[in-house]
Amino acid sequence: LDRERSRLVLILAGDHIYKMDYRPMIEFHNQSGAEITVGVMDIPIRQASRFGVLEINGDDRIVAFKEKPADPQPIPGFPDRALISMGIYLFKTESLVREVIRDAKVEESTHDFGRDILPRVIQEKKSVFAYPFQDWRKNEKRYWRDVGTIQAYYEASMDLVSVSPELDLYDPTWPIRSYLPPLPP
């Protein structure tokens, strides 16, 4: 981070499948003046205890965060839905460095964003905002799957091979680019 001198750092979970353009999230982050922005979405409350569940105020500022709570809080006005973290975190670089160094000094910490860092900075009323991947207030639906279990991985794989997949890997407006370096055999 010191060498690159980037202003922002985007941290992504490796066990999720979704399609997202991060530019609107970065724009939201910059306009809100947030130190940290968390990608969020709503899911049925019965499934929410598998994720980090959060509460927001009217300005989308995160006011509470609990990692995998036994009794998740519903979204106000939507008693059967909960707001969860997608494992997408956008940090101002200096905030990330400060909080990771600070957390490293805490012996009882598990050094986990959802268990330790986010709850602490939210409790301290730092500038942490929620960026909705899909807006429950507008009944938007977008494809996002956690594939952290074998069953979830299988179900997501089956989603992709359906006749009309929710996430179309052949969408010409969303090309998949990769770089395969020329390596010796």
Located regions from the model:
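Glycine-rich phosphate-binding loop signature in dinucleotide/nucleotide-binding domains
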Residues: 1-6
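Short aromatic/hydrophobic "clamp" motif used to bind/position activated sugar donors
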Residues: 9
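Active-site acidic Asp-centered loop
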Residues: 12-13
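Conserved core of the sugar-phosphate nucleotidyltransferase
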Residues: 19-94, 98
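Left-handed beta-helix
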Residues: 94, 98, 102-185
